[in-house]
Amino acid sequence: MAERKQGGQGNGVGSSVVTEVKPKTQKPSLYRVLILNDDYTPMEFVVYVLERFFNKSREDATRIMLHVHQNGVGVCGVYTYEVAETKVAQVIDSARRHQHPLQCTMEKD
């Protein structure tokens, strides 16, 4: 005759609790994209850049451009690292193609 083992695992009696662990995801760091004032880039080009690469209205672009002109620097927008890096590169590339010394940088928000 077959022997039966008493107790232990696998006898089908008992209960178990399964807890679902939700991973904690961090929000990505945000970066401010800044335009720096210079004495050579035309104001209209700065407005163009703000409209083209930052989707600003003419009114918002003009307001930001005047802020940059008066204060030396202005925030164009706040983005994740990759987006901010791309926008900085687009602005600098466009400025170079149009032969303007416009500078654009990013800093952690």
From Swiss-Prot:
Residues 1-20 are annotated as: Disordered. Signal peptide: none annotated. InterPro entries: ClpS (IPR022935), ClpS_core (IPR003769), Ribosomal_bL12_C/ClpS-like (IPR014719). Pfam families: ClpS. GO terms for biological process: protein catabolic process; proteolysis. Gene3D superfamilies: 3.30.1390.10. NCBIfam families: PRK00033.1-2, PRK00033.1-5. HAMAP family: ClpS. Binds to the N-terminal domain of the chaperone ClpA. Involved in the modulation of the specificity of the ClpAP-mediated ATP-dependent protein degradation. Belongs to the ClpS family. This is ATP-dependent Clp protease adapter protein ClpS. It comes from Caulobacter vibrioides (strain NA1000 / CB15N). The lineage of its organism: Bacteria, Pseudomonadati, Pseudomonadota, Alphaproteobacteria, Caulobacterales.
